Structure formats: structure tokens, C-alpha cells
Amino acid sequence: MGNLLSKENIIAPADYNRWRVPVASVAIYLCIGSVYGWSIYKPPLTRVLGVVTTAADDWNLSEVVWVFPVAIVFLGLAAAFAGKWLEQVGPRMVGVVCACCWGGGYVIGGIGIVTHQLWLLYLGYGVIGGCGLGLGYVSPVSTLIRWFPDR
């Protein structure tokens, strides 16, 4: 798999249609853009145990509201460091790491919700997922700039 992701193996054939690249980039942005829907998660998170009404052990809104800003901070940090790394390893490797972080962050955050461990929600969705978001923003932009230097 490492060979498939290496920078040397991402050269497209001469007859490759470059208009496939924006379609793939939009698909990536649609996936990672779901982070901006965080506000729909907040009310149900305050009723994890109580389901219909808030139970005594449920999280407060003030406890879960900071998950989104944590994700955005780590988005910025990851994007800042990813630019140089992308130049070294190529956009394909960065995209795969993005998918693993974003998907893995969702899974860890989900485990935190099921087990009622707030720190897992922050770690998964906020930190790991946020890093995946940052990587996800850098890779398509870099690829589009290279495929469309005339635009």
C-alpha cells in the first residue's frame, strides 16, 4: 500500500481528463464539510442518558459546546503543518491520512458518546477529527492548483 501512495506513483497518463479532479475535490469537501453541522448534535448530546428529557448524569450544553471550537483549532494547526508535509509525500498520502483521522475521530467520538466519556468525544471528534479536517482542506486545494495552473 505504501507504494501505491508514494509521490512517484501519482503521475497521470497523457489522456487523463483533468476535469475529474474538481469532482473528487468537491466530494472530499462535502465529506469534511459535515463538521459545520455540529449544532444539530448539541441538543441530543445533552440527553444521552435521559433520551427524552435530561437525566441527572447527562452532559450540560456548556460541556459539549466546546467540542466544535477544539475541532476548528486542530483544523488550523493541522493545515498549517500539512502544507510542507504534502510537498514531501504528495496529496494521495495526505488524503488517506485525512480519511483515517476524520473517520477514526468520528468512531472514537461515537464510542465516547456510547460509553458517556466526554473526554473521548473531545479527543475523537475534536482533536483527531480536527486534524483530519485540516489535512482534508490542504490536499484538494494543492491538487487543483497543480491541475489548473491556467485558471
Feature-to-residue mapping (PLM):
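Paired small-residue
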Residues: 105, 116-127
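Intracellular juxtamembrane helix-capping segments at the cytosolic ends
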Residues: 45, 126, 132-149
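C-terminal ends and interior cores of transmembrane alpha-helices
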Residues: 100-115
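Primarily marks hydrophobic transmembrane alpha-helices of the MFS/SLC 12-helix fold
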Residues: 92-95, 121
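Extracellular/periplasmic helix-loop-helix junction of adjacent transmembrane segments
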Residues: 40-77
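Helix-to-loop junctions at the C-terminal end of transmembrane segments
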Residues: 77-91
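Helix-loop boundary and gating motifs at the non-cytosolic
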Residues: 20-24, 36-43
